[in-house]
Amino acid sequence: VTQQTAEWNAEKAQQIVQAVIDSGETFNVIYAENDNMAKGAVAALDKANISHGVGKDVIVIGFDCNTWALEELLAGNWNYDGQCNPFQAAYIDDIIKNGVTTKVVIMDEKGFDATTITADDVANYGI
């Protein structure tokens, strides 16, 4: 397992993944905390002719549910993309500290798998 920070940046992610590829270390999963980092990681895989996505050599996981990223899922180039809203943190903190019980949903958290995503999902949930 190799873990490095790409600082939310596609170019930095590409450099990191390229360095891992160049090291000869084997891997089969890219887990990126945002879609841009996943995009950069995939660029390094593509440059090295390493297959990725459904049924391929490397599983690709991103977060943010950008429309373009969901389209990568739909095409089978990525395996999973999720939406996790950081704005919920203040609400959760308030519940813990003050016992607030009213439900506030800022954004539904979603997750999409490449084997089940539909064009409607891309249209309805892509940002």
Task: Kindly give the residue locations of the regions a language model identified.
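A residue-level marker of the well-folded mature domains of exported/periplasmic proteins
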Residues: V1-I127
